[in-house]
Amino acid sequence: MNAFNKLVKHSKKISNFNHLSSIVGWDQAAVMPSGGAEARSQAMAELSVHIHGLMTQPQLADWFAEAESETLNIEQQATLREMKRQWQQATVLPEALVEAQSLAGSKCEHAWRSQRKNNDWAGFEKNWAEVVKLSQEEAQIRAEATGKTPYDAMLELYEPGATTEQLNRVFSDVKTWLPSLIDVVIEKQSSESFIAPKGHYPAESQKALGLDVMKLLQFDFNHGRLDESVHPFCGGVPSDVRITTRYNESEFVQSLMGIVHETGHARYEQGLPKHLAGTPAGEARSMGIHESQSLFFEMQVGRSPAFIAHLAELAGKHFSAMNDPVFRVENIQKLYTRVQKDFIRVDADELTYPAHVILRFEIERDLMNGKIKHTDVPELWDQKMQAYLGLSTKGNDQNGCMQDIHWTEHKSIMSTAKHDYKNGCLQDIHWCDGSFGYFPSYTLGAMYAAQFMASIRKTIDVDDVIRSGNLTPIFTWLSKNIWSKGSLLTTDELVKAATGEVLNPEHFKNHLKSRYLG
């Protein structure tokens, strides 16, 4: 067996353990009782250490050296490149740091779920301080190994090839036109009337509706399922994709579009090249490309008038309210394209969402580069919310910096005024697991999605296809140009091969103006 095949075999062994980790992660978020948290954290930490050990075995260096001198075809060369990239990322971290991060992240994430509800920044901060410290250690180690800045080194984990310089340029441009566009659209919509859902929409009916929409989007139920969790996500593995949503029985709009979004993630996973399964080349290209697929489904397809006609019909059927004006197509369209400034990222509309992302990008960039301290975050959050959306989280961090979970697991300016942490810096799950460098993927994904749709429209009558209820031509394009490519190409190569150009944010800007200004 040559060195390349030894590496592929070893990669598939690692993939099997990652498979277990992913399914157990879904279980922890969706069905595990709270009493299982401590033991689960220990088990997950042990598994993380074992996987890290497999990825850093000493013989791998020799195998990579040998494989690089072997005669390989283009696909094998790309597979070798991706295996080596992941190996290099793993070997720079000491095992003790990997274990410490897993333990700190699990502890922080579990506590965050109750701390956010209670607006408990003080309690959260005690756990998060350790996550931030360990993530900064990781960022510094990666920076020294790659010659990048600490934040760029973390970006590489989610967006290979992306740099702070590129993101600063793209997001700085967005900040020149987005705030004024938001204000213009809000003013335009102020004279429009709509009917908000009122009444009782049972979770069982919402789930049945969601399953029907997943069928319309051609989700493969032989290789996936829908469940419920506090924070909607797509997990599992390509052969067993797990997506979740959350239900609010006083309305159905959020959970339904959340299912459309997560189905986009799932279809990408289910469409990855099966002959490369178990190797990095058979995985998603980047988180930005992953988000492009969920946002393509949600924003480009899901909020189009043609698709909303299907949603209106299905919703009316499942809630036995075909004559209810709430379910008229034009009303559902207004509900899904309504623009308003809000504290919560996951509830934000398409137009204001980039402002939430840019705020988080700027904070995590400066946090990883050591320009700010973790105790500065609530005050900075409030300043940026006021600058970008005209909202203040003083007296409010639950809908601010405590809303996302990503910063708590991976990886001092305190105002005397009481903050609403729940609606501010406590709202996201991302920072709970130390996923510093992830947030830009959301807006990059929206930009890629708009660019893909612009390209598809050159050869396909998208609106007619969606109206027909058979979306196969659209999915065939995505499969041919995105899904089946896995990580064989770099992000720039993938986007250029699919659309004829690398990322061009103008497509996103044009899409927003067309949809919201007509």
Regions found by a protein language model. Give the residues of each.
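Secondary-structure capping and boundary motifs in well-ordered enzyme cores
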Residues: 39, 100, 127-130, 170, ...
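Post-HExxH zinc-binding segment in Zn-dependent metallohydrolases
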Residues: 283-324
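Active-site recognition of the HExxH zinc-binding catalytic motif
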Residues: 254-274, 291-295
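A well-structured
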Residues: 1-160, 513-517
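All-alpha helical catalytic cores of prenyl diphosphate-utilizing isoprenoid enzymes
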Residues: 171, 175-178, 203-207, 213-227, ...
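C-terminal, non-catalytic "cap/extension" segments appended to globular domains
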Residues: 3, 22-25, 35, 39, ...
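Contiguous, non-catalytic segments that form substrate-binding/exosite surfaces or channel walls
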Residues: 101-252, 501
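Divalent metal-coordination and catalytic microenvironments
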Residues: 7, 143, 261, 294, ...
